[in-house]
Swiss-Prot record:
Gene Ontology cellular component annotations, sorted alphabetically: cytoplasm
Main location: cytoplasm
Pathway given in the UniProt record: Cofactor biosynthesis; iron-sulfur cluster biosynthesis
Stretches that traverse the bilayer: none
UniProt KW keywords: Cytoplasm
Stored SUPFAM superfamilies: SufE/NifU
Organism: Salmonella arizonae (strain ATCC BAA-731 / CDC346-86 / RSK2980)
Family note: Belongs to the SufE family.
Name of this protein: Cysteine desulfuration protein SufE
Residue positions of the active site: 51
GO terms (BP aspect): iron-sulfur cluster assembly; sulfur compound metabolic process
Function: Participates in cysteine desulfuration mediated by SufS. Cysteine desulfuration mobilizes sulfur from L-cysteine to yield L-alanine and constitutes an essential step in sulfur metabolism for biosynthesis of a variety of sulfur-containing biomolecules. Functions as a sulfur acceptor for SufS, by mediating the direct transfer of the sulfur atom from the S-sulfanylcysteine of SufS, an intermediate product of cysteine desulfuration process.
UniProt subunit comment: Homodimer. Interacts with SufS.
Amino acid sequence: MAALPDKEKLLRNFTRCANWEEKYLYIIDLGQRLAELNTQDRNPQNRIQGCQSQVWIVIGRNADGIIELQGDSDAAIVKGLMAVVFILYHHMTAQDIVHFDVRPWFEKMALTQHLTPSRSQGLEAMIRAIRAKAATLS
């Protein structure tokens, strides 16, 4: 995830975009920076229910107890939103993820107001799935 910005830089970059077209392009760019997900990880166990698009998220834990997230989607915007979520949860333990509320960050970005209802539901489904999987690891 080295190619992705940290939380603060994400917010700065996002607010520097002149309009929502630029913001959507930035979100898509973030999604393109995610590492490729292995074909074997695109399975029903890793598929996120509640998303209109196909979404897979894999959660692992490194030797230091830090959660590592990988994922993919067949929709560019959704993959970009996934990258935003991964940035917000970067360098956290499972317990940190369970207790961290991403919604204030979305509010700072005015993100949820500019998503279609189906994308907002999909974003919530991704967050719920990550938190639920993290809870089993904490």
